[in-house]
UniProtKB/Swiss-Prot annotation:
It comes from Xanthomonas campestris pv. campestris (strain ATCC 33913 / DSM 3586 / NCPPB 528 / LMG 568 / P 25). Acetylated. Deacetylation by the SIR2-homolog deacetylase activates the enzyme. One of its GO terms (cellular component) is cytosol. This is Acetyl-coenzyme A synthetase. CDD domains: ACS. Keywords: Acetylation, ATP-binding, Ligase, Magnesium, Metal-binding, Nucleotide-binding. Catalyzes the conversion of acetate into acetyl-CoA (AcCoA), an essential intermediate at the junction of anabolic and catabolic pathways. AcsA undergoes a two-step reaction. In the first half reaction, AcsA combines acetate with ATP to form acetyl-adenylate (AcAMP) intermediate. In the second half reaction, it can then transfer the acetyl group from AcAMP to the sulfhydryl group of CoA, forming the product AcCoA.
Length: 647
């Protein structure tokens, strides 16, 4: 089996960036960042051209990150208005519904522009002003993109909440950003099942602290019956349809907020990652164009949900700013059958396909036949995102899905980074299965040891970034101190990613996974603290500890150790009740895969839970527990090892 897949000369001959260009541009981006990003800023349309390009300090006593600080622009103008002259009739979004029996349809740039303007006017009429926060809780439908761009047009800050989150998670996010308006739908559709979106919003708005919400706009999607409370609830079409199809865009400073997106942290509640207008939009569009080697006639499909950052950057902002055609898929990979992805590729003649290793591993289990019965001959480039892809899944993706003729861009980045930071460029970089390979322009990765010493050469350590890039998050909304403490205090002067990483002799980067208390489940980050606090909030639970363990399909699964209060006994019923309790508190993505009853948890004499030991037990590696002599009661470990569920 090949360990290196050299650049295909035929691909390279036509590629946007060649090997030589990559080396030259990367060097310029590191040695002369102002010059490099000043030129790159010309990708955007500005009301006022920036003269200040980079103003950055990671020093704890003078921390600031500003890019293009005196520039003025509007993100929706860059995604829509500037496309109208030459691409007005081009398809911007190609909607593919949950069921293949429902109609798919294209939305042109001109239609999208008009829909965005109408909603922008409606939001202004409802009192939404520049800087107000709007929560978007929608399925994967075109109106989700319309809602995001309409907020951007009038200078409102959108906070998109993934449609799989439950009422408590919605309420947490609404309360944290003091949202003024919510845009939702009657119901979502996913794999043939209905998701009660409006009912979830109703439940969320009964929770104390959510009373900043004045209006709920409801998209009629499935036509399902929902409870409408006047005057708070309004039908989306009633408010939007009569509006003018022109809407004056707000002039935004480069550093004005564009959106907040909540992501799991290693402690407590989710944090609101705040991205600003110019740097984010520039970085999303630039990475999208270069990493995916974009052409004017590409049909590009990213299978993510807009509720995650991948959907923000690589379905909405990046592709539309580039005038691309993006597929928007409401469904799931295995409904109504496990050929669905490949059937959609053939139906729409998709040329670039970007999905998560979890989906690849799940479909790989179904064998080659469901793939081979489709053509996929339109494909020219494949991408992977969300978590490290194991070499076996990489090879299957390359050989079976891409017929050994499509390069794979294995992209590493985070909600916090706004866009792709480490990835091969298909015309410039040889591929290695499982490696994210080399950094994008302007990105300076380094590996450090536990003390923060920079490690040279082929080695393994914690991944940090030595300098800023335009797509970098600017703060945790409403909690700047948490931002500094989380990302910049561990290794002063650097941004700490929270990921471990190996660098090989060729300088290629191999992401090894989180080194903090965050689990990467199917490419979605789940904080162990969130799941623990959900479990402990159940009246019968005294204590809980949650760790990740290797999972064949999801990458990592959730393993929970639960200690019940005195007088309660474990049962199959209580097991089911606790799993559904977590689903209700957070959402289905946080459901524990294993829940082990624990008479006690391994603690130090000072009362700290030794998660390292729990991790090894969950990984079925009881011979690697290390020193347990510091535990208050070492016998606890023996009983946990004997009862472990992953043997």
């Amino acid at each position: 089996m090949a360990d290196v897949y050299p650049v295909d000369p035929a691909f390279a001959a036509d590629a946007r960036i060649t090997r030589e260009q990559y080396a030259t541009l990367y060097r310029e981006s590191i040695e002369h960042p102002e010059q490099f990003w000043g030129k790159a800023a010309q990708r955007l349309d500005w009301f006022k051209q920036p003269t200040q390009i980079k103003d950055v300090s990671f020093a704890l006593d003078d921390f600031h990150v500003r890019w293009f600080g005196d520039g003025e622009l509007n993100a929706s103008v860059n995604c829509l208005d500037r496309q109208l002259a030459t691409r007005g009739d081009k398809t911007a979004l190609l909607f593919e519904p949950d069921s293949p029996d429902s109609p798919s349809y294209p939305v042109t740039y001109r239609e999208l522009y008009e829909r965005v303007c109408k909603l922008g006017n409606a939001l202004r009429n409802l009192g939404v002003k520049k800087g107000d926060r709007v929560t978007i809780y929608l399925p994967m439908i075109v109106d989700a993109a319309v809602a995001m761009l309409a907020c951007a047009r009038i200078g409102a800050v959108h906070s998109v909440v993934f449609g799989g989150f439950a009422a408590n998670s919605i309420a947490d996010r609404v309360i944290d950003c003091q949202s003024k308006l919510i845009i939702t739908a009657d119901e979502g559709l996913r794999g043939g099942k209905k998701i009660p979106l409006k009912a979830n919003v109703d439940a969320a708005l009964k929770i104390p602290g959510t009373n900043t919400v004045e209006t709920v706009l409801v998209v009629r999607h499935t036509g399902g019956a929902v409870d409408m409370q006047a005057p708070r609830d309004r039908w989306f079409h009633d408010v939007v349809d009569g509006q003018p199809a022109e809407c004056e865009p707000e002039r935004m400073n480069a550093e004005d907020p564009l959106f907040i997106l909540y992501t799991s942290g290693s402690t407590g509640k989710p944090k609101g990652v705040l991205h600003t207008t110019a740097g984010y939009l520039l970085f999303a569009s630039y990475t999208h164009e270069v990493v995916f080697d974009l052409r004017e006639d590409d049909i590009y499909w990213c299978t993510a949900d807009v509720g995650w950052v991948t959907g923000h950057s690589y379905i909405v902002y990046g592709p539309l700013a580039n005038g691309a055609t993006a597929v928007m898929f409401e469904g799931v990979p295995n409904y109504p059958n496990v050929s669905r992805f490949w059937e959609v590729i053939d139906k729409h003649q998709v040329t670039i396909f970007y999905t998560a290793p979890t989906a690849i591993r799940a479909l790989m289990r179904e064998g080659e036949a469901p793939v081979k019965k489709t053509s996929r001959s339109s494909l020219r480039l494949l991408g992977s995102v969300g978590e490290p892809i194991n070499p076996e899944a990489w090879r299957w993706y390359y050989e079976v899905v891409g017929d050994s003729r499509c390069p794979i861009v294995d992209t590493w980045w985070q909600t916090e980074t706004g866009g792709i930071l480490i990835s091969p460029l298909a015309g410039a970089v040889d591929l290695k299965p499982g490696s994210a390979t080399l950094p994008f322009f302007g990105v300076q990765p380094a590996l450090v040891d536990a003390e923060g010493k920079i490690l040279e050469g082929a080695t393994e350590g914690n991944l940090v970034l030595l300098d800023s890039w335009p797509g970098q998050m600017r703060t945790v909304y409403g909690d700047h101190q948490r931002f500094i403490d989380t990302y910049f205090r561990t290794y002063p002067g650097s941004y700490f990613t929270g990921d471990g990483c190996r660098r090989d002799a060729d300088g290629y980067y191999w992401i090894t996974g989180r080194v903090d208390d965050v689990i990467n489940v199917s490419g979605h980050r789940i904080g162990t603290a969130e799941v623990e606090s959900a479990l402990v909030s159940h009246p019968k639970v005294a204590e809980a500890a949650v760790v990740g363990f290797p999972h064949d399909v999801k990458g990592q699964g959730i393993y929970a150790y639960v200690t019940l209060i005195a007088g309660e006994t474990p049962s199959e019923e209580l097991h089911k009740e606790l799993v559904s309790w977590v689903r209700k508190e957070i959402g289905p993505i946080a459901s524990p895969d294993h829940l082990q009853w624990a008479p006690g948890l391994p603690k130090t004499r000072s009362g700290k839970i030794m998660r390292r030991i729990l991790r090894k037990i969950a990984e079925n590696a009881p011979d690697q527990l290390g020193d347990t002599s510091t535990l208050a009661d070492p016998s606890v470990v023996d009983s946990l090892v004997n009862e472990r569920l992953t043997r």
